[in-house]
């Protein structure tokens, strides 16, 4: 049951400012969510500007239907399919692409979605509920090794192997089909307690990341965004945990360094390897005031780069 689906957009003004909006520009909001960033971008555009937003969550698509604006198009796709979404929208050479990655407050707060251990609900966890395997279905078939790797790699949980063994043993007695069942198994297994954090937190994060292939989606989306940008266009990415931020940091760093010099020398000046991105400023984090107003913003990090 949904208890609270209010969503407070994180780093709203900072993200839109980082895009360096041109009034007649073309922009992509690769993670529409509930449209906080999109609405703010639209407010900066004139009648010649255009915004294409992307989201794989059907509830986000439904929320986007409220925006009646000829400058705006919302595409139902995962952001890992950014190139396909751009083709569908008929855009190229855009002025900015924004990512606000990870799970949203409405997804967490809707107990029926199965993202949170705070509600006892079907163990689903799919961001796109129209396709793919649920978390319960995966746990029913996965081997101990696979469960261990997912929880260790995506949850950074040191009791991953013990949790995996517990899950496999428990499913022989009865199927694990609810968030309450999975959370109870994890709590029984994790022998240490971190202040202010439920023992199930890391395992729920890991399972969600795996079911939605969140890190892989980000890895394939960033090169597509770079290809889509025109020179001078901005790439802005907000992430919420170290696994995501590492991918963004490494991508931007690697693309800001020229490729190795070819062995076939001499070369003309136009043949010399050139970097593809310029890093813009330092990573930005929410202010103390924003974190106080919205505690879920505390782990956010925003990185900015400009295409050369």
Curated annotation (Swiss-Prot):
It is found in: Cytoplasm. It catalyses: cytidine(1402) in 16S rRNA + S-adenosyl-L-methionine = N(4)-methylcytidine(1402) in 16S rRNA + S-adenosyl-L-homocysteine + H(+). GO terms for cellular component: cytoplasm. Signal peptide: none annotated. One of its GO terms (biological process) is rRNA base methylation. S-adenosyl-L-methionine binds at residues 35-37, 55, 79, 100, 107. Specifically methylates the N4 position of cytidine in position 1402 (C1402) of 16S rRNA. This is Ribosomal RNA small subunit methyltransferase H. It comes from Dechloromonas aromatica (strain RCB).
